[in-house]
């Protein structure tokens, strides 16, 4: 059921030494008529944190496994209990090695797998797909104005948005996510 057909991103931009691409917030609300356990499957090109109804549910740090996404794209799975009524998914998506400016030593700026950070997410209950990543996700730059695997991050607290992954947050001024061309790699469980 999970496929790499539904990748989305926040921007077309690439990180360079002259211009950094911030990590982006992504959020999406949806309605559930009943409380039930659902499975989230997420494949990411970049590093991410995932939030459900305001709670960080990410497994570990620097998720997912690092890979050449022309070969493999690792995905993670989570189980959550849906609330009756509104539910919200939040994702903080950083560059990881996917959008690394590289340099003279590592040449990541010339890597064939290079792209703006992107992800594909499916929420399922048994065989039923409840939600998948699409342009209905809303995006906004996060306080992480620059993140690089080797050079660290620049954090600007002026961009903090309290409650951005909570149910009652107003995201009406946020932009819509963009569709992304999926990498060629084979999907593998992390």
Task: Specify the residue positions occupied by each region the protein language model found.
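Accessory beta-strand-rich segments of carbohydrate-active enzymes
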Residues: 15-16, 21, 26-160
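Non-catalytic, glycine-rich low-complexity segments
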Residues: 1-29, 188-190
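An acidic-aromatic substrate-binding cleft motif
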Residues: 165
């Amino acid at each position: 059921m999970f496929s790499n057909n539904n990748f989305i991103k926040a921007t077309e931009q690439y990180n360079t030494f002259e211009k950094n691409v911030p990590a982006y917030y992504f959020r999406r609300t949806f309605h559930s008529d009943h409380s039930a356990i659902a499975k989230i499957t997420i494949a990411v090109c970049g590093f991410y944190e995932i939030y459900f109804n305001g709670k960080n549910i990410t497994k570990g740090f620097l998720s997912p496994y690092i890979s050449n996404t022309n070969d493999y794209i690792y995905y993670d799975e989570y189980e959550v209990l849906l609330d009756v009524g509104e539910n919200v998914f939040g994702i903080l998506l950083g560059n990881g090695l996917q959008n690394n400016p590289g340099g003279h030593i590592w040449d990541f700026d010339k890597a064939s797998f290079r792209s703006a950070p992107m992800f594909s997410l499916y929420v399922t209950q048994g065989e039923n797909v409840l939600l998948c990543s699409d342009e209905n996700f809303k995006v906004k730059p996060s306080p992480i104005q620059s993140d690089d695997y080797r050079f660290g991050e620049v954090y600007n607290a002026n961009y903090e948005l309290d409650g951005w992954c909570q149910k009652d947050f107003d995201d009406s001024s946020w932009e819509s996510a963009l569709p992304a061309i999926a990498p060629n790699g084979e999907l593998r469980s992390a």
